[in-house]
Amino acid sequence: SFLSDWKIKKTKDALSQVNLHPTFRKIINIKKESRRRATFAAKRTKKGSMVGFHGRASDIIVEITECPVSDPILLSGMPTFSKFALLGSSRKAVLRISATVSGKSLDVKVDNGKELSATEISKFAQICNQSKIIRLMWNNDVIAQSNPPSQTMGLAQVVPPSGAFLQATKTGETALVETVLEIIGPAKRIVDLFSGCGTFALPISNKAAVHALE
């Protein structure tokens, strides 16, 4: 497609300027509504609350009702995020809400929230139970969890830390893993630097000994 060819050309031109001329693989285009993680901004307003994304290089929150690239499960959390802003933030504070899809559920990490009382924590747990949120971390403390928010990596089920980096789409992750497995070929000893949660190390471990570092 025009867009794929344009992206490859832009990358080739940039690398050629530093005398690098790698072989390029075909670009894999990901279908819409497949992004599985996003960071929302939420705050109280005079009339209630608002949830959206920060404008580029801006403190302005752009309120959204839809997002064509995001998994619908992500967007299903927005009414709950609005409640978080109403109940868990001061008038001037903006909540940073990092949400990740885990199966049919959500793993959510909230930063910049107010300190919660025991009664408020209980209320938030009830809110989560009425939504798709299976784990809620509030200012670095897990205050609600009904099930472990696991991710499949190779043959393993991994529960990443709240807000941990994952490839934006599962399809993209699968393509990268398949490419890495192809590149390492029959090698039996592998070192994985910056291994994160094990995106590459765990699938590789099915065929080789892996020393993973982060």
Predicted regions, residues:
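Accessory RNA-recognition modules of RNA-modification enzymes
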Residues: 1-214
